């Protein structure tokens, strides 16, 4: 059984939100699954050591429609790529007709998808209800990042123990998700007053 999960939302945060459902699908079918995601989901980094994920396929779409999978021709390009992999089952975490068409053109016989054309929804609630209905089991919303223990131990040994090391994920995929920089500064000052700390900023050049 070859299973594909299509998760087209952008950003690391959204990718992590969907992890419990990807893991649940993998456990249900007792096989690692492949995922179709956008590059800025950072799935290649987040899931590098995740045994529930077999292959990470990048969906190249952009806001200005310049990605190789954008437009009508992009539908055929990505469906051709997927068809080569001979998937038996797909879970589509999106209500777009586009991804239904892609799955059908890819020759995937069993398709589970959000209700077509649904746009406004709660990302966590919708994913949870959809997955639980499809798998007929309760799924926790708590995400788990599977990390290589040796890598973690080696990294930990390189840090001084004289103070706490705090990583701040200040990046966001949209303006409604951003927290003002003044809030981060106030938070760091408050933490540092209680516990001497060193802060690391996880963000891009434009954040």
Predicted regions and their residues:
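Catalytic machinery of carbohydrate-active enzymes
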Residues: 1-207
């Amino acid at each position: 059984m070859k299973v594909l999960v299509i998760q087209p939302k952008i950003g690391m945060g959204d990718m992590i939100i969907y992890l419990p459902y990807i893991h649940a699908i993998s456990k249900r079918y007792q096989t690692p699954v492949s995922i179709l995601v956008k590059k800025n989901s950072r799935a290649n980094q987040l899931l590098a050591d995740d045994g529930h994920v077999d292959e990470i396929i990048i969906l190249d779409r952009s806001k200005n429609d310049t990605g190789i999978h954008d437009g009508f021709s992009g539908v055929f390009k990505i469906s051709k790529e997927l068809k080569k992999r001979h998937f038996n089952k797909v879970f589509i975490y999106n209500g777009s007709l586009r991804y239904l068409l892609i799955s059908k053109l890819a020759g995937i016989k069993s398709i589970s998808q959000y209700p077509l054309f649904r746009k406004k929804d709660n990302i966590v609630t919708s994913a949870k209800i959809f997955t639980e209905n499809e798998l007929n089991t309760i799924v926790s919303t708590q995400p788990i990042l599977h990390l290589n223990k040796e890598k973690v131990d080696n990294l930990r040994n390189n840090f001084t123990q004289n103070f706490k090391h705090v990583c701040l994920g200040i990046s966001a995929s949209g303006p409604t998700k951003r927290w003002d920089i003044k809030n981060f500064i106030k938070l760091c000052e408050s933490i540092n007053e209680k516990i001497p700390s060193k802060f690391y900023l996880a963000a891009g050049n434009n954040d």
